[in-house]
Amino acid sequence: MNISYKWLKHYIDTDLTPDEVSVALTSLGLEVGALERVETIRGGLRGLVVGHVLTCIDHPNSDHLHITTVDLGDGQAPVQIVCGAPNVAAGQKVIVATLGTKLYDGDKEFTIKRSKMRGEESLGMICAEDEIGVGTSHDGIIVLPGDTPVGMPAARVIIRTIMEEG
């Protein structure tokens, strides 16, 4: 029988990790044969990292685009990303699809490439929930807590958030 950690947390108030729950269940005589992570998000969030928006200015050739400078925490110079989200602002921690990342729009796969938007270079994409498959909102980008480490893989952030929310 397979039991979801999220389902179990719905019935048991605990701060234990899945590994710790496995040990606890086994010690109670309920043998856990294996822990398995199931990929329910297409692409598994590969290529997505936490970025820190250092600057955000209005695009001179658009009434809704913004030009941002984003630190990806990789030791390289910050990158310029053009973003159309109404809620993007300097100082935010965000999820960034880096160059080469594969994202999905329904059944269509597309790759994040270096591009120009209204004459300004963009080297990635700051993501909303629906763009990475973790929700349906397209009202704006995902803004993470201020203490989220820059450069952390987005998969770790999303998994941590899901586990915290139960």
Q: Where do the protein language model's features map onto the residues?
A:
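Phosphate-backbone binding interfaces of nucleic-acid-interacting proteins
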Residues: M1-G166
